[in-house]
C-alpha cells in the first residue's frame, strides 16, 4: 500500500480538553502557565492562547462539569505538549510551577528536547518543553535520529536566564 504523506506544512492547531471546573482550569492554564484568555463562553467554555492566536487550547465543561478524571488504564489523551521557544523560556515556566507549588511528575532530557511533565487540575498530562536546534540533535552512525531519555538537570535549567536585549545584541556583533 502506497501512502501519500501529509503536507509538511500541516500542524496541530489546538487541543480541546474536557474539564470538571472551568475556573479552576483557567487558574492553572492562565494563572500558572501564562496563557491568555481569548474568549470565554459563560461557565461552560473558554479558549486560550499564546501569542494572540485565536486558541491553542479549548476548555469545556459540556460533558464533564463536576466529573472525575478518566480511570487509570482507559484510553484517551496521554498528554498535551507546549513547546517553548528557548531554554530560558522553559526555565521561566519551571519557576512558575515552583511558585505555584505544582509538582512535577518527571523532567527529562531527550537529546532533541528538554521536557517537564506534570498534571493539570483535571489530571490531564501536560508536557512543557523546548527543542534543541536540529543541528544538535543526536544521531547514530547511520545518521538516524537517536533520541534518549535521561534525567534533566533542573538546577542547571533554573540557572538559565534570558539575556537582556542589549546584551544579546552585543553578543551578536
Name each model-derived stretch.
Residues 1-6, 11-20, 68-173:
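Vicinal oxygen chelate
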Residues 3-16, 30, 41, 47:
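Hydrophobic, helix-prone linear segments
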Residues 19-21, 52, 110-112:
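Conserved beta-strand-loop-alpha-helix junction that forms the acyl-donor binding cleft
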Residues 21-36, 96:
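Amphipathic alpha-helical segments
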Residues 24-25, 43, 92:
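Short Gly/charged-rich anion-binding patches and loops
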Residues 34-40, 104-107:
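Short secondary-structure junctions
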Residues 36-74, 125-132:
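Conserved short beta-strand elements that form part of the metal-binding/catalytic scaffold
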Amino acid at each position: 500500500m502506497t501512502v501519500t504523506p501529509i503536507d509538511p506544512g500541516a500542524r496541530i492547531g489546538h487541543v480541546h480538553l474536557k474539564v470538571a471546573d472551568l475556573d479552576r482550569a483557567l487558574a492553572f492554564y492562565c494563572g500558572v502557565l501564562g496563557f491568555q484568555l481569548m474568549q470565554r463562553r459563560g461557565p461552560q467554555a473558554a479558549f486560550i492562547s499564546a501569542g494572540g492566536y485565536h486558541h491553542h487550547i479549548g476548555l469545556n465543561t459540556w460533558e464533564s462539569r463536576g466529573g472525575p478524571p478518566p480511570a487509570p488504564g482507559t484510553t484517551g489523551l496521554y498528554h498535551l505538549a507546549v513547546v517553548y521557544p528557548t531554554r530560558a523560556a522553559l526555565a521561566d515556566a519551571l519557576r512558575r510551577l515552583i511558585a505555584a507549588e505544582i509538582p512535577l511528575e518527571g523532567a527529562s532530557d531527550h537529546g532533541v528536547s528538554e521536557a517537564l511533565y506534570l498534571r493539570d487540575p483535571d489530571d490531564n498530562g501536560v508536557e512543557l518543553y523546548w527543542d534543541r536546534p536540529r543541528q544538535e540533535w543526536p544521531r547514530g552512525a547511520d545518521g538516524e535520529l537517536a533520541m534518549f531519555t535521561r534525567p534533566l538537570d533542573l538546577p542547571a535549567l533554573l540557572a538559565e536566564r534570558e539575556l537582556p536585549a542589549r546584551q544579546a545584541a552585543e553578543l551578536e556583533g
